[in-house]
């Protein structure tokens, strides 16, 4: 039986040596509503901007985000962009950057101008020198790469054709890795797959595959046939062709193709999705999974990546939500462990335009009255967060004999309900701090309160939100249930 937790534990033990073209990705978001009076060119009214580690650096970030360690070897120029990337990579606890500085070229930088409303790219500006690294830089790159091979469980070459992965660097790295029994995954850019000879797996997209094989690659059968010829030339074990919304096809040498459909998702930005696929394939294969399991994980990760704006990474929690059935996520994914985790989930929901609701309570012994309030609350919003009093908070409010169930047990019961999307445990006597942080669009309590008695009502009202009071079911309360149980025992 598939165990996601066991997979994550195995991933955490892996080290990936990632080599490739590092770049800075900048995204400038805005809208165009007029043409410049100076020239027939659109004027972009800038609303915000984001800066991310891109190219092979994004592969390294995804390796680290999913829980593995990454030794990253890349090239930077002697400029502010290079120093910024070096600092950013150095701040990642799971990434060990080994960067070579080439003062003869700029650090690659790409600036994309994107419609905030439609998430469409309007323009891209590049600062780069794409020529192969000079012989002395090649040697410095190899001096950085080869000593790290023994420490790695798997090697990943991320080729953006920006000068790092020259024919010599590719050849010497693959040959040295094979001598040590290390598998090598290549995300190729060159149409000459023969330069990657001896790699374990090549992961071209359909356009790259078509250019390299000169095949139409219009059907899975055509891809499989062309892949067998390409693998014979490249002497690799398998080829994975990514096909955007049509999923991906893996062709093992001499074996039957494996097709995995794309997961349904609203696509916001495809930038860096190939990086995510390569990273997840590497760490999952290094962990001992087979081709099918690695493809399944990579497909799920790609679905998460394209649903985000900009160059994005995928976390274990996001991957879990895509891979596992919804019902199995309750205790593990619905219970928030930190404010940062809560903020990230809120950011994602608001990016999707979802209406967030909030209710709270001790929920010591869940009864039909609770279920009615929770169901009504979920019906008034798109995502419901339940604030749960901690054990210490319950004791202060209800007395030393309470709670009957400890906070983790209460949280797991709530998380198992379909109406509940998140459970946040709070230590204070009231959920005011949580409400202030969340700023819900809907605040829900039982009808035994008045609007003015509902903690946080003024915060919600100030933001244009609603306060909803749900009629309580008579005869149902935790206090009365506990009292009746004790009377029965005596």
Curated annotation (Swiss-Prot):
User: SUPFAM superfamilies recorded for this chain?
Assistant: Nucleotidylyl transferase, Ribokinase-like
Residue span of region Ribokinase: 1-328
Disulphide linkage map: none
InterPro entries named in the record:
Bifunc_HldE, Carboh/pur_kinase_PfkB_CS, Cyt_trans-like, PfkB_dom, RfaE_dom_I, RfaE_dom_II, Ribokinase-like, Rossmann-like_a/b/a_fold
| Ranges where the record places region Cytidylyltransferase | 358-490
Residues annotated as the enzyme's active site: 275
Any one GO CC term of this protein is: cytosol
What terms describe the molecular function in GO for this protein?
ATP binding; heptose 7-phosphate kinase activity; heptose-1-phosphate adenylyltransferase activity; phosphotransferase activity, alcohol group as acceptor
- GO annotations under biological process? ADP-L-glycero-beta-D-manno-heptose biosynthetic process
Q: Which residues bind ATP?
A: 205-208
Task: Write out the transmembrane intervals.
Answer: none
Copy the pathway line from the protein's UniProt record. Nucleotide-sugar biosynthesis; ADP-L-glycero-beta-D-manno-heptose biosynthesis; ADP-L-glycero-beta-D-manno-heptose from D-glycero-beta-D-manno-heptose 7-phosphate: step 1/4; Nucleotide-sugar biosynthesis; ADP-L-glycero-beta-D-manno-heptose biosynthesis; ADP-L-glycero-beta-D-manno-heptose from D-glycero-beta-D-manno-heptose 7-phosphate: step 3/4
Quick check: keyword ATP-binding in the entry?
Answer: yes
UniProt entry tagged with the keyword Transferase: yes
Family of this protein: In the N-terminal section; belongs to the carbohydrate kinase PfkB family. In the C-terminal section; belongs to the cytidylyltransferase family.
Which NCBIfam families would you find in this protein's record? Answer: cyt_tran_rel, rfaE_dom_I, rfaE_dom_II
Q: What name has this protein been given in UniProt?
A: Bifunctional protein HldE
Q: Which organism is it from?
A: Rhodopseudomonas palustris (strain TIE-1)
